């Protein structure tokens, strides 16, 4: 239990930050799944368009340090490889 006023305030702020970070993390997972769904669907043009929008989402979440930059790079690399592996 937080005893000092400072600790109580930090606990309140942590609750808000946790909710916000969870929301951003959910956006990340949704963006990744959208690209994967387009790849499975077989439409390369749609997959590329979805990938372009997802890249900015992934980068912005990494910039906010919600995920590590290397994890963001790994996601982008794997999604890009999946799109390149598709037959045109």
UniProtKB/Swiss-Prot annotation:
Keywords: Ribonucleoprotein, Ribosomal protein, RNA-binding, rRNA-binding
GO biological process: translation
Protein name: Small ribosomal subunit protein bS20
Protein family: Belongs to the bacterial ribosomal protein bS20 family.
Entry keyword Isomerase: no
Cellular component GO terms, alphabetical: cytosol; small ribosomal subunit
GO terms, molecular function: small ribosomal subunit rRNA binding; structural constituent of ribosome
A Pfam entry, by short name: Ribosomal_S20p
Organism: Aromatoleum aromaticum (strain DSM 19018 / LMG 30748 / EbN1)
Role noted for this protein: Binds directly to 16S ribosomal RNA.
